[in-house]
From Swiss-Prot:
Cited InterPro entries: EryCIII-like_C, UDP-glycosyltransferase, UDP_glucos_trans, UDPGT_MGT-like
Domain of life: Bacteria
Entry-linked NCBIfam families: MGT
The family this protein is said to belong to: Belongs to the UDP-glycosyltransferase family.
CDD domains: GT1_Gtf-like
UniProt key word Glycosyltransferase: yes
Pfam families the record matches: EryCIII-like_C
Name of the encoding gene: ydhE
Name the UniProt record assigns to this protein: Uncharacterized UDP-glucosyltransferase YdhE
Keywords: Glycosyltransferase, Transferase
Length: 395
């Protein structure tokens, strides 16, 4: 029986894509150990993992990523979390012999692989990036304005080297961990410029395990209705103005409008919505998408994949991170209509939804991507490739 150690970045868009493969490892009889935070413990245990917890600095530290200080704070969280994880790994490795480590692009993955000196498999929750995309990041040594570390960061990195004998090659490693194999939760068809990536990249498509969550959402109200579903994900702040635009745009819509407002939205700042609107902080997204005719989204990879899975055409309003790249790819494949967050108004929103509902090319484009997901490498083949890697390494 193999023993796998899984590491991840503690955010929805990173943890959720790994649930399928975590369950696959467990179902195959692997002993699965997953290092994460309290927030994700239950769902990881439901997928068959033994969970070991570290501090959730990401949720408890306010970060403004747009500012130089925000980027420094983000790096500091990575370094401190890596130290926490390395200590857990050091303790676990006294009694457990791990065969390989499976880790996210973000975080401590390569550090732990180097510390344990075992095979490493990386996991990409979004598209793969070419080197030219990484060079734009302030964390890259060749970026125009590389990030200056403060004394606290220098001291923490020195402590890492001294205590665990490992150090990042450069700061970009915290956002681009590589493995001897790289698992990608999309298809070669959807991946931009996919011919640049070799056979070490395993395109397995996204997985959609049923989430064990109870909700009082009135899903039956969506049956036999035209449905617009609107969500800006779980991370964005100050979404109230946008949701008010949606209320203006779709007050006359002949069907249901569902807004997943998120935990951060202040619902008292929203206008009085007509009766055909359902607005809630939390919405069971998979169930709602199953009934939806169009999905207005920020373009986060998780949400986009879920929309594709149910063949729901997309109106995409990207904000940051990988969202502009995802939006551009959807546009290239005629699967999404892209609108600018800086120019959006009620008229533009209404036009976008009318266009997507009226023009069949969007549904056809989405279905083509969905088909490519179904044709991805299956879990059995992924396991075989990992087994082969371990055998090679142990020769």
């Amino acid at each position: 029986m193999k023993t796998v150690l899984i590491l991840n970045f503690p955010a929805e868009g990173h943890v959720n894509p790994t649930l399928g493969i975590t369950k696959a490892f467990s179902d195959k009889g692997y002993d699965v150990h997953y290092i994460s935070t309290e927030k994700y413990k239950k769902r990881l245990e439901a997928a068959g993992a033994t969970v070991h917890l570290h501090r959730d600095l990401l949720r408890t530290t306010p970060i403004h990523v747009g500012s130089p200080n925000g980027i420094l704070d983000f790096v500091k969280i990575h370094i401190k979390t890596s130290l926490d994880i390395l200590q857990i790994v050091k303790d676990l490795s006294k009694s457990i012999q791990f065969d390989f480590v499976y880790y996210d692009k973000f975080g401590a993955g390569e550090l732990v692989r180097d510390y344990l000196d075992i095979p490493g498999v990386s996991s990409s929750a979004s598209f793969l990036f070419g080197e030219e995309h990484l060079k734009i990041l302030p964390l890259h040594p060749e970026s125009g304005a590389p990030l200056e570390l403060d004394q606290e960061c220098e001291d923490l990195l020195a402590k890492m080297k001294e205590t665990y004998g490992v150090a990042p090659k450069n700061l970009v490693q915290f956002m681009n961990n590589k493995g001897e194999l790289n698992v990608v939760y999309t298809s070669r068809y959807f991946q931009p410029e996919s011919d640049r990536f070799g056979d070490e990249c395993l395109f397995i498509g996204p997985s959609f395990p049923k989430r064990a969550e109870k909700t009082d959402f009135p899903i039956e109200q969506l049956k036999d209705e035209k449905v617009i579903y609107i969500s800006m994900g779980t991370v964005l702040d100050h979404t109230e103005d946008f949701f008010n635009l949606c209320i203006d745009a779709f007050s006359g819509f002949n069907g249901k409008v569902v807004i997943a407002a998120g935990e951060k939205a202040d619902l008292t700042k929203l206008k009085q919505a007509p009766e055909n609107f359902i607005i809630a902080p939390y919405v069971p997204q998979l169930e709602v998408l199953e009934q939806s005719d169009v999905f207005i989204t920020h373009g986060g990879m998780n949400s986009v994949n879920e929309g594709i899975h149910f063949s729901v055409p997309l109106v995409v309003m990207p904000h940051d991170k990988d969202q502009p790249m995802v939006a551009q790819r959807l546009s290239e494949l005629h699967a999404g209509y892209v609108i600018s967050k800086d120019e959006v108004n009620a008229q533009i929103l209404k036009q976008a939804v009318d266009e997507v509902l009226r023009n069949d090319q969007y549904t056809a484009g989405i279905k083509k991507i969905n088909q490519s997901f179904k044709e991805c490498m299956d879990m059995e083949e992924v396991m075989e490739r990992i087994d082969e890697l371990i055998r090679q390494k142990n020769k």
